[in-house]
């Protein structure tokens, strides 16, 4: 599973996730990508479940790029704990994903296989998703 090797701060504030992603909105490495249509925190377990769903459907063919990394810890207090007494203990790791961010990319498999693999991966995630195709530069192919 994806976890950071070291972090500067063990506990972080939640912050806000407003607006679209600033970068990573296009398919850069592969041929097809899975794009988020909502903003949400995605845990390292959800990322791993999506990766396994894709690679199993593709029968270990092709290549998968994971373009998000869970670098923030999330905390929770015990169930019967009263208010106050500080912030809870770190429970796991999350990746903040904003709207329009491409989270996964796939290459090296036929289009229908890639689309089905990305659809299965999207079912494992807590956001609505869209499958996007890599656009050619300027609407033309680069075969000059």
UniProtKB/Swiss-Prot annotation:
The keyword Nucleotidyltransferase does not apply. One of its GO terms (molecular function) is tRNA binding. PROSITE patterns: RIBOSOMAL_L16_1 (PS00586), RIBOSOMAL_L16_2 (PS00701). One of its GO terms (cellular component) is cytosolic large ribosomal subunit. CDD domains: Ribosomal_L16_L10e. Pfam families: Ribosomal_L16. Residues 1-20 are annotated as: Disordered. Keywords: Ribonucleoprotein, Ribosomal protein, RNA-binding, rRNA-binding, tRNA-binding. Transmembrane segments: none annotated. GO terms for biological process: translation. InterPro entries: Ribosomal_uL16 (IPR047873), Ribosomal_uL16_bact-type (IPR000114), Ribosomal_uL16_CS (IPR020798), Ribosomal_uL16_dom (IPR016180), Ribosomal_uL16_sf (IPR036920). Residues 1-16 have a biased composition (Basic residues). Part of the 50S ribosomal subunit. Belongs to the universal ribosomal protein uL16 family. Binds 23S rRNA and is also seen to make contacts with the A and possibly P site tRNAs. This is Large ribosomal subunit protein uL16. It comes from Limosilactobacillus fermentum (strain NBRC 3956 / LMG 18251) (Lactobacillus fermentum).
